[in-house]
Amino acid sequence: MSLSERQREEINRAVAEYLQNNGYSEAFNMLLKEASLSENDIKPLGGILEKKWTTVLRLQRKVNDLEAKLLESQQEINHGAPTRDKRQAADWIPRPPETQKLIGHRLPVTRVIFHPLWTIMASCSEDATIKVWDYETGQLEKTLKGHTDAVNDIAIDAAGKQLVSCSTDLTIKLWDFGQSYDCLKSLKGHEHTVSSVTFLPTGDFVLSASRDHTIKQWDISTGYCVFTFRGHNDWVRMIRISHDGTLFASGSLDQTVSVWSLPRKQRNWYFEIMSMRWSVSKPEGNSTHILFSGSRDRSIKAWNISTGEVIFTLSAHENWVRGLAFHPKGKYLVSVADDKMMRIWELSAQRCMKAIEAHEHFVSTVAFHQTNPYVITGSVDMSCKVWECR
């Protein structure tokens, strides 16, 4: 394809403007001479060369996305799977490529969560910050600073008005979320790294887990610890609460996973495991009390909370399983691991139905939006990614 005389003149003027605006005077004068242009010919074009360049890049990304979706659709047709238009919302799962890659943290991302109502998400990192993003546009909205060491976990209350964070600096912080983003309270009482934190469904209490072997319950109105759960003999790495708020699970480096009764303030049962690192999660809206745990032994286990027995085991990851998240309808489980993969499991068939290479380094965390078709992941590569479900 050859350019017309007018198109060549427009390109010459745009390049000349770029050279002039960026101080390349020698190249600018040489171009004027060789292209038979005068300075009067160089009218302000508003940085048209840069605009065309960025437009080409955006179009190329769109072309790549469309080609990936076309390839995926062709593969689904070849394998007899339903195409996107014929899939029900209950069958939507995350699919590549990612719609956004969020860059801003300076150290590994430790946790990602969605806001329950708005199109924003939050991420925390070993760089001691919490960042708030618009997950549809990829825009960084706010950076929360206050911790002096790695932020290990964050949670948002059901109303979406408050965020709680915990850190290696031994503190738990309560933040206003959505208005001022100010730190409202600092909760102190743990004697070592605070590794996990969660709101009770009522929003008036917070649970925290620590390397000091304890789990504490805090009244957020006063900032006081109202109860300390004891029973683990080593670092309590993670806690997660059931949707009705009556039970919570904890995973520890003492090689046990425990289930506790909040009303009775006691441990219902604990089960010894052969693994050292746990991610525990509880499917929403499930009348049967089932707990899923992911471990350093590369497996995911489903537990009967009433008996403490393993119901089944899912195996496919090739390294530590770091995070779990449930599909809103409870049909699928999403897992991420140090093998850099995100896997989608069909629970009824107990099989891995899709594997996605999610990041260039270990994938440390995952979250599934409860109403909108999005999944987010965070990684040791310091990035977060947004995945559309379809």
Curated annotation (Swiss-Prot):
It holds the Pfam family WD40. GO terms for molecular function: dynein complex binding; microtubule plus-end binding. It comes from the Eukaryota. The lineage of its organism: Eukaryota, Metazoa, Ecdysozoa, Nematoda, Chromadorea. Signal peptide: none annotated. The gene is lis-1. Residues 7-39 form the LisH domain. One of its GO terms (biological process) is cell division. WD repeats lie at residues 104-145, 146-185, 189-228, 231-270, 272-313, 316-355, 358-390. Residues 54-80 form a coiled coil. Gene3D superfamilies: 1.20.960.30, YVTN repeat-like/Quinoprotein amine dehydrogenase. Positively regulates the activity of the minus-end directed microtubule motor protein dynein. May enhance dynein-mediated microtubule sliding by targeting dynein to the microtubule plus end. Required for several dynein- and microtubule-dependent processes. It comes from Caenorhabditis briggsae. InterPro entries: Dynein_regulator_LIS1, G-protein_beta_WD-40_rep, LIS1_N, LisH, PAC1-like_LisH-like_dom, WD40/YVTN_repeat-like_dom_sf, WD40_repeat_CS, WD40_repeat_dom_sf. Belongs to the WD repeat LIS1/nudF family. CDD domains: WD40 (cd00200). This is Lissencephaly-1 homolog. The keyword Cell division applies.
